Amino acid sequence: MPEPETLPTTVLTGFLGSGKTTLLRRALTAPALADTAVIINEIGEIAIDHHLVDFVEGSVVELPGGCLCCAVREDLARTLRSLIDRRAAGDIRAFRRIVVETTGLADPAPILYTLGADPMLDHCLHLAGVVTLVDAVAGAAAIDRFPEAARQAAVADTLVISKTDLAPFGPELASRLDGLNDRARRLLACTADDPGVVLFDGTTR
């Protein structure tokens, strides 16, 4: 019997102020995410195209573009297991991939560990990639000052440089990123009009 296909899972991270929430808000109603379950890190209301989606315990909201969205309750592993169980039972519409948003201060390492260490998640999911937003204005200073910002950049498969409309992607930030992670592809957020390109293209590990 062939092995069941696992769900590709993308981790979206970025330090405070990097524009991660802005990207996520655009992505949530994009056609590219119509078959995607997105796990956000904040419980409560999020404004999406003038709609307020109110997340309550256990809720999974289908957004206008067809994306399924829920908020982390208690811990990520439990949230992921619940989504997978409800998908298998037909309680929610089937999805083909998952995006996990981290908090701005999160070290991604424990999240990546969770995906591989939990037996059920390891059986049902695979890590497609890590996408990290880096602020062109304050990114170099954040990397120097905050270990979490450096770790977010270091584990990325894709580095998305944001706020290049306010400051160029200059040699200082480029040097920091080269020292931390010279293998990741780099995108400028202002030229990445399709959130699906940012989140999915080229991130398969």
Where are these regions (language model features)?
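Nucleotide-state-sensitive switch-loop elements of NTP-binding domains
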Residues: 2-13, 18, 22-142
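Flexible active-site lid/hinge loop adjacent to a nucleotide/diphosphate
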Residues: 140-153
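C-terminal accessory "lid"/substrate-recognition subdomains
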Residues: 151, 155-205
